[in-house]
């Protein structure tokens, strides 16, 4: 598929041929969902914790004698049925991460890219470079391009001035090509790739 290339100023800068094996797939939401769930599970803190009966600071002595009271039989006061007792099967500190095959992760990325291309939400920039790190100037460029919510992906190195200028703009994310991922692609309305990013993606999935 062929897509027009624009500059930051909104001027035409030729066109680029995009590989159908990366940008022309019929998006499969089930694969995309698997990758997003994997990403979110991996970044979950997992610091939740409640005390079990073994961790409660309370005596382990038998509460009262076994027989002759007319009451139910009880041993420890740390058990869950008593006020102040430990939680039964409570959450513990753990990692929520799980494995997802590399091929599924790669396929999920290609389907996310194809989904943006199919929706008309893919923009290709000639380059993402700013001489002066001025947020006001960059906001003007973005409004001219109609970008209010976008993920901008550059080549192996992001231009320092561009990254600094974009840092304070809400709903705008800037990543190098190594950081491109399914979740960040989907959470913004537009996906903006530089020509360097397109070349890197095509080399990666060759």
From Swiss-Prot:
Keyword Ribonucleoprotein: yes
Matching Gene3D superfamilies: 3.40.1370.10
Keywords: Ribonucleoprotein, Ribosomal protein, RNA-binding, rRNA-binding
Pfam family, one: Ribosomal_L4
PANTHER family, per the entry: 50S RIBOSOMAL PROTEIN L4 (PTHR10746), LARGE RIBOSOMAL SUBUNIT PROTEIN UL4M (PTHR10746:SF6)
Record-linked NCBIfam families: rplD_bact
Subunit-level organization: Part of the 50S ribosomal subunit.
Name of this protein: Large ribosomal subunit protein uL4
Organism this protein belongs to: Afipia carboxidovorans (strain ATCC 49405 / DSM 1227 / KCTC 32145 / OM5)
Lineage, uppermost ranks: Bacteria, Pseudomonadati, Pseudomonadota, Alphaproteobacteria, Hyphomicrobiales
Gene: rplD
């Amino acid at each position: 598929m062929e897509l027009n290339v624009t500059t930051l100023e909104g001027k035409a800068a030729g066109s680029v041929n995009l590989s159908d094996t990366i940008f022309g797939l019929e998006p499969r939401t089930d694969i995309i969902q698997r990758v997003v769930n994997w990403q979110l599970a991996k970044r979950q803190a997992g610091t939740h914790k409640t005390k079990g009966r073994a961790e409660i600071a309370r005596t382990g002595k038998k509460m009262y004698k076994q027989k002759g009271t007319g009451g139910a039989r009880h041993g420890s006061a740390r058990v869950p049925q008593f006020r102040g007792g430990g939680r039964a099967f409570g959450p513990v500190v753990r990692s929520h991460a799980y494995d997802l095959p590399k091929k599924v992760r790669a396929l999920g990325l290609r389907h996310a890219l194809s989904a943006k291309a199919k929706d008309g939400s893919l923009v290709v920039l000639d380059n993402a470079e700013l001489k002066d790190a001025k947020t006001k100037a960059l906001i003007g460029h973005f409004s001219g391009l109609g970008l209010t919510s976008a993920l901008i992906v550059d080549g192996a190195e992001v231009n320092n001035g561009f990254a600094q200028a974009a840092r304070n703009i809400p709903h705008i994310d800037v990543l190098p090509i190594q950081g491109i991922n399914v979740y960040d692609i989907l959470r913004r309305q537009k996906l903006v790739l530089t020509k360097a990013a397109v070349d890197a993606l095509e080399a990666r999935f060759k």
